[in-house]
Amino acid sequence: MNTRGSAQTVMNTIPTTFNEALPSYTVIGGRERLGASGLSAVLLNRGRRFARRSIFHDMKKAGFDIVVSVEPPPAQYDIDELSAQFPFVRFVLLKTHLSLGEQINLAMSEVDTPLLFVLWNNMRLVSGGGAYRMAERLSSHEQDPDGQDGAFRRLCTVPLMQSARFETLPTLRVPVLPRKKEYTRGLSPSQEGSRSLYPVDGVGIYDRRRFIQIGGFDGALKSAYWQLMDFGFRAHLWGEEISATQMMKVSYETDPPPEDTSVGGDYRRFYLKNIAPIFRKDSAHLPLRRFPSFLLQSREGLFDACKNFSEGRRWVHANRFRWRCDPRTIASLWLPGSAEDGFSAPGQETSA
């Protein structure tokens, strides 16, 4: 076994760099590389163990360069056998249970291909061609900002998704009208390139360079829903694109878990990082005048509210020149209303 990764625990402060809070983990296998398409696959695991050999055979047939299987504890008895049978699979053994976003962050640190397809163990690829064809479709045939050939179209491309009953799932997420208890609504993509606020269930093909540049997922958020909301809002605020494609399709073998949109500390963190900052000209800031309403509505004591607000201000200041727009602009991609009106200060979020 080879132990990799930082021995740090996940920090309570908001990370400003991609990998400053990666946990410790163990890697087994993955010595071989299947191809040179530029696209690797990440397999996230939840629930019962599905037909793993069948899954890995399908991924081999698709021709992914590398396959990373993120294994929650406890480690399964057949890992050594599987790593010998499938030497292109890199088994990442977690020492503790990690959130969805933390698992994707960790997988990103384990591959060097420009594209990464995040999938679940209860999914199957239905259409889209092999890895080479999928990567080719996403190529922009332009140079990336570093002057290298092979730039890709967007931060994340979301495939069509089917239920276990072969029904098309509403995988587009759009902001809802203001003052609702729900924050997003699911729609089925009707055309190629339809925008989505975030990749549902974390599933999609990610541009690794763009992903790392925006900081990946915030590991301090434990709710998968608010991790995805934070990732999606930050991506759009910073000028990135998340869109759906109808040229790739995956199917669930069992129904995915429903999204838990409960509010709490994760919502407050999301609010401070994405909704509260004010964007002017070429930068953003979190003004002190936002603090009184945050204190009154956060249900926190003065000390905790000050600490969290100050932390949010520091994070916004450190990244202030990354902003390209404000929440109203993001909302205008789908709605005539304002996202800032729809996402109120903590404590007001459930008002009608």
Predicted regions and their residues:
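N-proximal low-complexity "stem/linker" segments adjacent to membrane-targeting elements
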Residues: N2-H57
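Short beta-strand-to-loop acidic/aromatic patch adjacent to the donor-nucleotide binding site
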Residues: P114-V126
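Acidic donor-binding segment of Leloir-type glycosyltransferases
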Residues: F56-L93
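Active-site-adjacent helix/loop segment of glycosyltransferases
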Residues: E241-F343
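Short, flexible, basic/aromatic active-site loop/helix in glycosyltransferases
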Residues: P175-L197
